[in-house]
Amino acid sequence: GEASPDFHQWTIDQDTTERVIGHAIDSGVNFIDTANCYAFGTSETYIGRALKRLGISRDRVVLASKVYFNEGHLSQEAINHEIDGTLKRLGTDYLDLYIIHRFDYGTPIEETMEALDALVKAGKVRALGASEMYAYQFHNMQVTAEANGWTKFTSMQCHYNLLYREDEREMIPVCRQYGVALTPYSPMASGHLARPKWNSDSKRSITDNTM
């Protein structure tokens, strides 16, 4: 996506995006995760354009995107609006996984879960995921979906790696209870666990404080 001076300064251009995705597919990687807010939507655009230019068929990739950091957060109106924008930017008519980026304190859980369930029933989304919230909030959302016969979450994207293991206390046990898969973010602690020296002179190492 397009770099911003104050958000994800380490992003790559379109040509590099295509090389990275092409190499990933050739290496057996097929899960591509993005969000409507990454690089202000241009991350989705670059990914969709790369898949088209590389001639990668839709059934060869698992596409995931997220919703929350937008006007209306997780209201029904916002979800319905944002999914259409995401699908258009990615150049597809469905997502394999749609993730709520955060818990929305301003919208009733029932409204959010019903809206997400409607996307699954409409064929715009195949599965639902959540990210970065308290375990009790995730549990309450699952209970709400279960009680109403709505689609439950099948994945949790939490902050989890060998250095940061807080979610082993409560979130991961809740995920086990519901048979929810983990798709952690920063699994290599922003690269710190993947190189012999703690720091490097890369733009991401200098500007990304996420461990």
Model features per residue range: what roles?
Residues 17, 24, 32, 47, ...:
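Conserved, mostly hydrophobic/aromatic
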Residues 48-55, 83-88, 170-179:
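Short amphipathic alpha-helices and their capping/turn segments at secondary-structure boundaries
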Residues 1-61, 93, 121:
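N-terminal binding-site loop/beta-alpha segment at the start of enzyme catalytic domains
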Residues 11-24, 73-91, 111-114, 138-143:
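Short, acidic/polar
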Residues 1-15, 67-80, 101-107:
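Active-site mouth loops of central-metabolism enzymes
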